[in-house]
Amino acid sequence: MSTPIRILGIDPGLRHTGWGVIEQSGARLVHIAHGVIDPPTDLSMAERLGHIFEAVGELARHHAPHAAGVEETLVNANPRSALKLGQARGAAMAALAMAGVSVAEFAPRQIKLSVVGTGTADKDQVKFMVQRLLPRAGEMKLDAADALACAICAAHHLPLQMKRGAA
């Protein structure tokens, strides 16, 4: 039996940053934990980013992942929203880097394809499949489901060296 590899998935957002932790042992995936980071909306932008940074850093310290998968920013019709989302993503990635966690980035389409089988799946389809792939996960918010999907995608795509934190 192989040594379990712990993977943290992050679905970044300024209002809701989803997170999920899984362990991979061979082809088997096991749910460890999931949740959503909700920075208070009355904080300034810098304070919200700091909140995300601190919370993701604490998750990395508590769960000690070997690797992390972070969803890439989808550039949409609103460049201002994409920029703000990118800042939240940067705060999460910086926290992971500070904790010494290897980070891989995945496009939303790649995550959906990896979990659902189609890159055009909607959030409810992703959540449905995450709950099927990780039956012990129980009920979850969509942001947490997206983060777990990112962790599952990372489990499928990361090279073994990165999963183990090797240089």
Curated annotation (Swiss-Prot):
Coiled coil: none annotated. GO terms for biological process: DNA recombination; DNA repair. It catalyses: Endonucleolytic cleavage at a junction such as a reciprocal single-stranded crossover between two homologous DNA duplexes (Holliday junction). Mg(2+) 1 binds at residues 11, 143. The keyword Hydrolase applies. SUPFAM superfamilies: Ribonuclease H-like. Its EC number is 3.1.21.10. It is an enzyme of class 3 (hydrolase). GO terms for molecular function: crossover junction DNA endonuclease activity; DNA binding; magnesium ion binding. GO terms for cellular component: cytoplasm; Holliday junction resolvase complex. Mg(2+) 2 binds at residue 71. InterPro entries: RNaseH-like_sf, RNaseH_sf, X-over_junc_endoDNase_Mg_BS, X-over_junc_endoDNase_RuvC. It is found in: Cytoplasm. Binds 2 Mg(2+) ion per subunit. PANTHER family: CROSSOVER JUNCTION ENDODEOXYRIBONUCLEASE RUVC. The RuvA-RuvB-RuvC complex processes Holliday junction (HJ) DNA during genetic recombination and DNA repair. Endonuclease that resolves HJ intermediates. Cleaves cruciform DNA by making single-stranded nicks across the HJ at symmetrical positions within the homologous arms, yielding a 5'-phosphate and a 3'-hydroxyl group; requires a central core of homology in the junction. The consensus cleavage sequence is 5'-(A/T)TT(C/G)-3'. Cleavage occurs on the 3'-side of the TT dinucleotide at the point of strand exchange. Homodimer which binds Holliday junction (HJ) DNA. The HJ becomes 2-fold symmetrical on binding to RuvC with unstacked arms; it has a different conformation from HJ DNA in complex with RuvA. In the full resolvosome a probable DNA-RuvA(4)-RuvB(12)-RuvC(2) complex forms which resolves the HJ. Belongs to the RuvC family. This is Crossover junction endodeoxyribonuclease RuvC. The gene is ruvC.
